[in-house]
């Protein structure tokens, strides 16, 4: 599949069939993340793969809204770092996360980015801190997002190229 088509097809999937993800597919997704560009090549990320049903369910309650797809995912990847390791950790982790999502799409899997950084649970506690507690992460580790992964159990149409927001682009000469 060419890259443009891959980007056009990549959508957020929030419903999954429950069918497991092949270990080789998970490895390819992680390899894609590990090959991502990073500022000064510091590679500040730490990826935590979660397949345990109870842990997925617990992570789905880490923030007040929007995390329920984690509970129904076949697997999830917590995208984490210690901010002290790099001043570009947010950018580096964001790049690696979308590259992993693109790899998942290319493999025929669905994914959705569940934002944890700067989000709170129903009691006002930081979602990132909840993730650290649930996953047993070292002190100082921040969770940018959790990627919920699985075989899609919903249809999503590709982006309609005719409906792109070209009004938000300037300086392009035709």
Q: Which residues are covered by each model-predicted region?
A:
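Acidic, surface-exposed loops and disordered segments
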Residues: 1-174
